[in-house]
Amino acid sequence: MKNLLAVIGIAIVFTYVIGSGLWVNTGDNWYRTLNAPSWQPPPAIFGIIWPYNFIILGIAAVTIAQRAATTTTLIYLTFFALSVACALTWAFQFYRPHNLSFAALALVGTVLLTIPMTVIAFRTSIGLGVALLPYQIWVAIAANLSYTYSRLN
């Protein structure tokens, strides 16, 4: 059962990676015409943080599946899947129909859903919880960034 749950966790990460790749497009003309927040991180930061986030999410899913009780793992994976659904809703709403306000709300959902994930990670392993904190912080920054985009545009 633990191996199956680990595979499900990895599948959620792959869904996140593939979905993000399908919808996020910062190179198109529409995105370039947006008024960007003055505090937006430079593109290089995105190139560093996202690979880290995807890797640590995979490590967290496998570690929790292997070390935590089955019920705890199922709770973690449920919050993880829902948070990814919200994050992908953001990507779609922001870059396809350009619904910036709804996109920002979707990221707020991601932020809220990652809180119990981080708590479970800390309860499983202090080191794992610490390693997952950058993701929690990043989605909070992203939600604020998305909200600011919706206000400016």
Positions of PLM-derived features:
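Non-cytosolic membrane-interface motifs at loop->transmembrane helix junctions
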Residues: 34-38, 100-109, 129-132
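Membrane-interface loop-to-helix entry segments
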Residues: 42-55, 98-112
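Terminal transmembrane helical module of multi-pass membrane proteins
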Residues: 123-153
